[in-house]
């Protein structure tokens, strides 16, 4: 049985679409982070492979993982409402590399990434995971710095226009926060990719990389902070 740890605000239609791939479980807000991203999965936890990291003070998330029987590692880095104290877990691994704003990234996560043989690559954008839709070695982002770093790392990467993604309370969301890994070869989007100006280009890019694309609703893309998939 697979599970998706999701933003509690994720709409019912998207939950129903996700239910074909696994059960949705809402993550409670974490009061150390700013509203509304305090309920975004990509701000609350991160994964390297099957290994999950969670903020030490985010006990509600830890209880959910324990209930599911999922082992996890704690991030000891202090969390705060102001950037970059909110991005300790906003990082990702792809193609043998680990990307994040390393000065703000959890020490436990960086140490584990090194143990796994990943090459650490620092970028300026602290919301690294938020900024990228990732599947295998394929990365799509609107952030020029991440685009250059991923390209230098030899990954397959596509640069798209910024904005055009909704988010609660802010001017624009991120593509990574509007996407979710459904399985090893399938990437889902919270909304209709065809309503994004680079939507068809994004779809073609992932399909060329052998990744199927699934739109989880007919609405414009919306950043719910992605999801943590537990198998």
For the regions a protein language model found, what residue spans apply to each?
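Histidine/cysteine-enriched polar flanking segments
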Residues: 1-231
């Amino acid at each position: 049985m697979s599970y998706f740890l999701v933003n509690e605000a994720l709409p019912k239609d998207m939950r129903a679409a996700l239910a074909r791939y696994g059960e949705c479980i809402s993550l409670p807000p974490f009061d150390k982070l700013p509203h509304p991203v305090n309920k975004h999965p990509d701000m609350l936890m991160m994964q390297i492979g099957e290994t999950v990291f969670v903020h030490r003070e985010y006990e509600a998330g830890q209880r959910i993982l324990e209930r599911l029987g999922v082992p996890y590692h704690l991030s000891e880095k202090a969390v705060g409402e102001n950037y970059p104290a909110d991005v300790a877990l906003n990082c990702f691994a792809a193609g043998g590399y680990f990307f994040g704003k390393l000065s703000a990234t959890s020490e436990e996560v960086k140490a584990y990434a090194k143990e796994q043989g990943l090459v650490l690559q620092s970028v300026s954008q602290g919301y690294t995971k938020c900024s990228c839709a990732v599947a295998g070695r394929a990365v799509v982002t609107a952030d020029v710095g991440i685009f250059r770093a991923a390209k230098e790392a030899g990954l397959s990467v596509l640069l798209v226009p910024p904005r055009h993604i909704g988010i609660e309370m802010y001017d624009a969301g991120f593509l990574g926060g509007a996407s979710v890994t459904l399985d090893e070869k399938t990437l889902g989007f919270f909304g209709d990719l065809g309503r994004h100006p680079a939507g068809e280009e994004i779809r073609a890019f992932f399909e060329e990389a052998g990744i199927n694309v699934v739109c989880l609703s007919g609405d414009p893309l919306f950043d719910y902070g992605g999801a943590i998939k537990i198998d």
